[in-house]
A protein has these predicted regions:
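Active-site PLP attachment segment
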Residues: 1-8, 13-27
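Short glycine/serine- and small hydrophobic-enriched flexible loop segments
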Residues: 26-34
Length: 352
């Protein structure tokens, strides 16, 4: 019953802001009315640009996600006022290699100036391949939380901060100072107990004697071994989508009727998913009810399971699957549709 309650709630709820509700607030609407509202957000854009410039000038490893060059000149060499009103400085140009994205057209995509996206070492942006050493962004995110700065979210090698008019340069300078401090700790290979004291205290036996670079290397090697970035890409490419076997609504009804069974992740291969499964980030369903477990989705969740066991304290949030401990190891379990003969027996009241 508890799992069904959570399933029903998460199907119709989100942790993301509900923007129509925000827009309906009278005070919020008044603040954004007319020229004053546009000026507030222009100030936010300007602060975001200046923060990116500070990071480019003071950090060697953590970089803002913007073009390296614009018309042959460094991004940060232009005046802030010019950058703030010219989309060239936030534009994805086909053929450029600062991001390793592909399959888009001219003027199709732009970086949102109010989303301060930073990248960490570990993936060569020019070819999309893993480098020998990397700093998974979740380690940086935990360091920032330890020091009172909460990022919006992080992925394999990127971390995101949402900028609003509530952010002033003092806050952004504090963020930059922490980024610089993290890089110094990384270069000095500081003891993990100093960098992430909360996680170290919770898992002292596991991380005894660890340094920051040692943790980064171990997590980076895990991602590279499973080629997790490629799995992420494949999960959202049409040619790799899970095969549909049932109407999603019918699969959900089967779940509500109890015509399902909870199985270990390896045993789910080839079975029909009864729940949508979602790792956060990216916060997007990778398999939906009625689809067949397998392929990139199954391999991705298997990699996450290995990471949960290998590196405690860094588990991502998972929805639609369940972490259960057996024989000292945490395992991922999920609900799948029972075979038809088992469902018939269930309807007849037979014991299964």
């Amino acid at each position: 019953p508890h799992k069904r309650m959570n399933n029903a709630f998460m199907m119709h709820a989100s942790t993301s802001p509900f923007y129509p509700l925000f827009a309906a607030l009278d005070i919020n609407a008044k603040m954004h009315e007319g020229v004053s509202g546009r000026n507030m957000w222009m100030d936010c854009v300007v602060n975001g640009i200046n923060a990116r410039k500070l990071i480019l000038d003071n950090c060697q490893h953590i970089r803002p996600f913007v073009p390296e060059l614009v018309d042959g000149k460094p991004w940060q060499s232009y005046e802030t006022a010019q950058i703030a009103v010219d989309l060239r400085f936030f534009k994805f140009v086909p053929g450029e290699h600062w991001h390793s994205f592909e399959g888009y057209a001219e003027n199709q995509y732009f970086v949102d100036p109010c989303k301060l996206l930073l990248t960490t070492p570990g993936i060569d942006a020019r070819n999309g391949e893993y480098e020998a050493f990397g700093v998974p962004a979740t380690i940086l995110a935990n360091f920032l939380r330890e020091n009172g700065v909460v990022p919006e979210k992080c992925d394999l090698n990127s971390i995101l901060f949402l900028l609003t008019p509530a952010e002033d340069m003092a806050k952004l300078q504090q963020l930059v100072a922490l980024l610089v401090r993290f890089e110094k700790l990384l270069e000095a290979d500081a003891p993990l107990a100093e960098v992430l004291p909360s996680i170290y205290k919770q898992h002292e036996e596991r991380y005894a004697g660890y340094t920051l670079r040692q943790l980064c290397q171990e997590m980076h090697d895990l991602y590279a071994r499973h080629n997790v970035k490629q799995l992420q890409k494949e999960m959202f490419r049409k040619e790799h989508f899970p095969r549909v076997s049932m109407n999603p609504q019918e699969a959900n009804y089967a779940y509500l009727r109890g015509e399902v069974e909870l199985v270990r992740l390896p045993d789910a291969e080839g079975r029909i998913a009864a729940e949508g499964a979602l790792p956060y980030p990216p916060g997007v369903l990778c398999v939906v009810p009625g689809e067949i477990w397998g392929g990139a989705v199954l391999r991705y969740f298997s990699a996450l399971e290995e990471g949960i066991n290998l590196l405690p304290g860094f588990a991502p949030e998972l929805q639609g699957v369940y972490i259960e401990e057996h024989d000292g190891r945490k395992q991922v379990w999920c609900y799948v549709i029972k075979p038809r003969d088992a469902q018939s027996a269930l309807l007849k009241g037979e014991k299964l």
